[in-house]
Amino acid sequence: MLKLGIIGTSWISHEFITAAHQTGHYHLQAVYSRKMKTAQEFCEPYGAISCYTDVIDFLDSELDVVYIASPNSLHFAQVKLAILAKKHVIIEKPAVTTPSEWKELVKLAKEHQVYLFEAARNYQEAAFQVVKDFLSNQEILGANFTFAKYSSKLPALLAGEIPNIFSDVYAGGALMDLGVYCLYLAIGFFGEPISSHYTAQQLPNSVDLYGQGVLIYPDFQVAFQAGKNITSHLPAEIYTKTGTLTLNAVAAINQARFVSHSGEVIDLPIQPCPHQMQEEAEAFALAIAHQKPSAYLEWLQTAEQVHKTLYQMRQSAGIQFKDEKE
């Protein structure tokens, strides 16, 4: 049983705890927050859980793995401290804001013999591998992915506030929050693109509300949309020489149907998981138990390619975060 610590007290941390407990591999041990009241209120549903307001004391406690879901710009420093304390680390996507930060964390994790995971749930879903296996026998002609969901924080933004998700201080925006899922799908299926470009609707601080991206491959292109000021119900489509594969969504894939040009229909064997984060929690636990050595190396490589592409796309759109260095 892995002793789990949590940094970040938003709804996503509650979801991960639920999923982690459902796997039977984790036990919630401790929670860190800057305010004790916040930590205590967060822990109420879980019984007697240790609460900390000092991150060093938190990391010095008996923990095996730390899940981090704080604002994006805080990830790097917090992950670094956790690795130095010899804890395995699961970081909610995007794990970092620059490719160099990711490379540094991977190097540090290797030196301290701990595991480092970026939690991009669609990449760890069993459905992802089912789709990838199907595509391995197809000639790809292109793809179109969309992840756009109206943000609950948009009214506050329109009222003149700057919520973390729209802040350049905290590395927010549609590309970082939702577009990263599209990149994981594309790069996970097709590999690293040879070039990429992103255009966006931006706030005065350069953070994007909505954008359209293109990934260029030698023989095809992948287009995607990411938005936090609109909601899209479009499916994801992958175009092949023999037909079109349609996924119900970019994340939480529970249906995949291929329709050939002749009208033949093939429904891929997708089994929806009871909780959308359970499969990633299961995969990380198995990796820590040394049951997925080759997969783990592939995950690190994919994450490196995602962050390289993510950074290039931000630069092409002129999205700059406060005090970032690369």
Predicted regions: what they are:
Residues 91-92, 116-118, 247:
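Hydrophobic residues in well-ordered beta-strands that form the structural core
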Residues 65-67, 283-326:
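C-terminal helix-rich "cap/oligomerization" subdomain common to oxidoreductases
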Residues 271-282:
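Active-site loop of classical SDR/Rossmann-like NAD(P)-dependent oxidoreductases
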Residues 125-192:
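Predominantly a Rossmann-like dinucleotide-binding segment in NAD(P)-dependent oxidoreductases
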Residues 104-121, 140-142:
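Rossmann-fold dehydrogenase core element
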